[in-house]
């Protein structure tokens, strides 16, 4: 969010990067108030698991009011009211970045009232009459599709980018071939070895090759190629699913390890990682 944040001058961070050559570079650089929310940190830091959403709103509201003490706030103290007061009185919009927006959906799947409260908060922020008056942009990362209740999506005004439908931003999902070759030349690494380990994605209609950026940068630091991703917490969850051997998952994986393709239908997956009805949903 350093690119958008108006509280600093970020030219030194971006002037020598490719983005500086874009026509809109100066248009958005350091032009907005920014809010970064890490939903996982709110979950782990909550004093009461049933008040995660309330505590998140209270903490963010407190921070905003502390940052803008001269703003006249209304008697309605919702987060949206506070943001609207700042945006209208200061004449500057917000850019909000929400990391792992779906963490609560995954961690509290057995608490429907808490989840509905969370979705209603997001709806109030991003699907209301004042949304465009407050936000210049909102970016949310997550594993699951936008959560729905009933037949209506809570946030159907968002554009979703996924591994299956990444266009036109697929080249930003990781390191491209060109970027990886530049790193290999700079740090004296074997490109072919990195390609063997980490170019596991071909995205979009152009089948753009994408390298895992975390793994590549770890090799830049250590000089050693190996499966770094398997040491992450996320892999533990995947391993548990594999060990269940649901609907022949183990056999399908063994087939893929011997270079045999396995067909997977990804379009049927909903938005609940705790409800797996088929091998296709598990792989997705």
Model region roles, listed by residue range:
Residues 1-284:
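Phosphate-binding site recognition
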């Amino acid at each position: 969010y350093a690119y958008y944040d108006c509280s600093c001058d970020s030219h030194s961070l971006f002037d020598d990067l490719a983005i500086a050559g874009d026509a809109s570079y100066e248009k958005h650089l350091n032009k907005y108030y920014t809010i970064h929310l890490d939903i996982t940190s709110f979950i782990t830091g909550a004093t009461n698991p049933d008040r995660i959403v309330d505590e998140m709103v209270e903490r963010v509201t407190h921070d905003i009011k502390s940052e803008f003490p001269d703003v006249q706030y209304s008697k309605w103290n919702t987060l949206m009211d506070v943001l609207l007061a700042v945006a209208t009185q200061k004449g500057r919009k917000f850019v909000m970045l929400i990391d792992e927006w779906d963490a609560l959906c995954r961690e509290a799947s057995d608490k429907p009232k808490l989840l509905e409260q969370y979705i209603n908060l997001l709806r109030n922020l991003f699907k209301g009459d004042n949304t465009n008056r407050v936000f210049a942009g909102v970016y949310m990362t997550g594993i699951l599709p936008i959560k729905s209740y009933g037949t209506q999506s809570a946030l159907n005004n968002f554009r979703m980018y996924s591994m299956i439908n990444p266009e036109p931003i697929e080249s930003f999902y990781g390191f491209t071939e060109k970027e990886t070759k530049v790193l290999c030349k700079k740090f004296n690494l074997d490109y072919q070895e990195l390609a063997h380990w980490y170019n596991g994605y071909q995205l979009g209609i152009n089948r753009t090759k994408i390298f895992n950026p975390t793994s590549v940068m770890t090799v830049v630091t250590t000089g050693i190629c190996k499966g770094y991703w398997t040491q992450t917490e996320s892999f533990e969850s995947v391993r548990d699913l594999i060990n269940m051997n649901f609907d022949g998952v183990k056999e399908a994986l063994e087939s893929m390890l011997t270079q045999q393709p396995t067909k997977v239908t990804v379009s049927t997956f909903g938005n609940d990682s705790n409800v797996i009805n088929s091998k296709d949903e598990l792989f997705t």
